[in-house]
Amino acid sequence: MTSTFNPRECKLSKQEGQNYGFFLRIEKDTEGHLVRVVEKCSPAEKAGLQDGDRVLRINGVFVDKEEHMQVVDLVRKSGNSVTLLVLDGDSYEKAVKTRVDLKELGQSQKEQGLSDNILSPVMNGGVQTWTQPRLCYLVKEGGSYGFSLKTVQGKKGVYMTDITPQGVAMRAGVLADDHLIEVNGENVEDASHEEVVEKVKKSGSRVMFLLVDKETDKRHVEQKIQFKRETASLKLLPHQPRIVEMKKGSNGYGFYLRAGSEQKGQIIKDIDSGSPAEEAGLKNNDLVVAVNGESVETLDHDSVVEMIRKGGDQTSLLVVDKETDNMYRLAHFSPFLYYQSQELPNGSVKEAPAPTPTSLEVSSPPDTTEEVDHKPKLCRLAKGENGYGFHLNAIRGLPGSFIKEVQKGGPADLAGLEDEDVIIEVNGVNVLDEPYEKVVDRIQSSGKNVTLLVCGKKAYDYFQAKKIPIVSSLADPLDTPPDSKEGIVVESNHDSHMAKERAHSTASHSSSNSEDTEM
């Protein structure tokens, strides 16, 4: 049976900074990891990749049934060359329909044994193991989580032990000897046993762990590889965001979008009976996380409405209900990470943006004044006649951009910006690792308004020392627009396309030590 199918081996090579020139994605109601949008004359086209191909193996690793983010990560880690084993779309669908073992295609028996168990989850001697960090959400039952914490002589960190059979921890996916990386979004790799126990106690009746299993932890220590929290598996979480796709009806989509009061962000309200919104599964009080694949977590009400309208006669929303939102906030993860794990363009094999949760439910009350004071700030600026009224500065050779020379009474001053504030996000996009010029361009391209997440120098140093991700949810929410209580109907007779004005005139100068642009 397998001899009737002919997979192709495609070897792609690119230059540093170049893209492979294709998209790797998954699609609704379509099986497999699909190759899409193969660019003309790109490394992908030259290697023989075609639109609709399904990726079976990456560098010999069988990936057909693995999570999309893991497949993306394998390509990303391949550097400037990667070998893909692919099957054309028609053959793939026939193979699936006739239940052909896709692992056997294009592989000798010897090759099959090399690396099929690299990706997670796999069964190893009856025990499930993983090769990436994973989030586990525990809700206490009968006053117990069903686990204990231990330290191991000669090893740094705290580990899971005494897992109660069929207890809360086991059902949540916790394994014996798991290395505990985070408690409620806070890194605890350098914390003592007593400190970790105290954090878990303070968490109350629910807690979120970021864990890695024993074997994976051992490999990372031996290879001196640091875990990236944004690669964490969300598979074990009991509540997940929902992707809602709608086509506009004669009376619009049939819902109101309202700025939340208790809940930060934009909330779905007053869904019309029988409307496209109701039929697509949208629910009252859903929080909008993304519109047509773009995060809207830090955008204001009018901007989100405009993004929906720009979608024309159809739109795709990533939404969460209150329970799911609270769970993700506890982990300091954005629900947008779920969208990225489902479908991520990978022609450029780009890094996933740093998580930017919409809001944060504090898992334990701060017990010191120091913790209360350490907050980032969300600042919304409206451009004046002379720009935004601040200079953007960066130290050559060092990451990060920061605020200088805030003009008294200017837009930046009125929005709460201060000298030495470090810029974390521009319009919801994390820019900490972006070059100075790109940060400048993002601000200038924002038109007449820009939303910045910034952090004072002392607070920034504190978060860095504690390994706490700086996210918008830690900041106080922006003021709710005065008309938000009335709601805005997203419907067909409002389809204006507001062109964003790009600022062309900026005063700038540079020296041997810094680069400085007036906004």
From Swiss-Prot:
GO molecular function annotations of the record: PDZ domain binding; protein-containing complex binding; protein-membrane adaptor activity; scavenger receptor binding; signaling receptor binding; transporter activator activity
Domain PDZ: 9-90, 134-215, 243-323, 378-458
GO biological process per UniProt: carnitine transmembrane transport; positive regulation of protein localization to membrane; positive regulation of protein targeting to membrane; protein localization to plasma membrane; regulation of monoatomic anion transport; xenobiotic detoxification by transmembrane export across the plasma membrane
PROSITE patterns: PDZ
Tissue: Expression is limited to epithelial cells. Expressed in the kidney (brush border of proximal tubule), pancreas, liver, and small intestine. Expressed at a lower level in the adrenal cortex, testis and stomach. Overexpressed in breast, renal and lung carcinomas.
Chain positions with Phosphoserine modification: S108, S148, S192, S250, S334, S348, S492, S508, S510, S511, S512, S514
Biased composition regions of type Polar residues, renumbered to the chain: 357-367
Pfam hit, one: PDZ
Region annotation Disordered: where it falls in the sequence: 347-374, 479-519
Record key words, sorted: Cell membrane, Membrane, Phosphoprotein, Repeat
GO cellular component, one term: microvillus membrane
Low complexity: bias regions: 505-519
Modified residues (Phosphothreonine): T451
InterPro entries assigned to the protein according to its UniProt record, in alphabetical order: NHER, PDZ, PDZ_sf
Self-association state and partner proteins as the record states: Interacts with PDZK1IP1 and ABCC2. Interacts (via PDZ domains 1 and 3) with SCARB1 (C-terminal domain). Forms a heterodimeric complex with NHERF1. Interacts with AKAP2, BCR, CFTR, SLC22A12, SLC22A4, SLC22A5, NHERF2 and SLC17A1. Component of a complex, composed of PDZK1, SYNGAP1, KLHL17 and NMDA receptors. Interacts (via PDZ1 domain) directly with KLHL17; the interaction is important for integrity of actin cytoskeleton structures in neurons. Interacts (via the first PDZ domain) with PTGIR (via non-isoprenylated C-terminus).
Domain notes: The PDZ 2 and 3 domains seem to be involved in the interaction with SLC26A3. Interaction with the C-terminus of CFTR could be mediated through independent binding of PDZ 1, 3 and 4 domains.
Family: Belongs to the NHER family.
Its job: A scaffold protein that connects plasma membrane proteins and regulatory components, regulating their surface expression in epithelial cells apical domains. May be involved in the coordination of a diverse range of regulatory processes for ion transport and second messenger cascades. In complex with NHERF1, may cluster proteins that are functionally dependent in a mutual fashion and modulate the trafficking and the activity of the associated membrane proteins. May play a role in the cellular mechanisms associated with multidrug resistance through its interaction with ABCC2 and PDZK1IP1.
Entry protein name: Na(+)/H(+) exchange regulatory cofactor NHE-RF3
Native organism: Homo sapiens
Gene name of this polypeptide: PDZK1
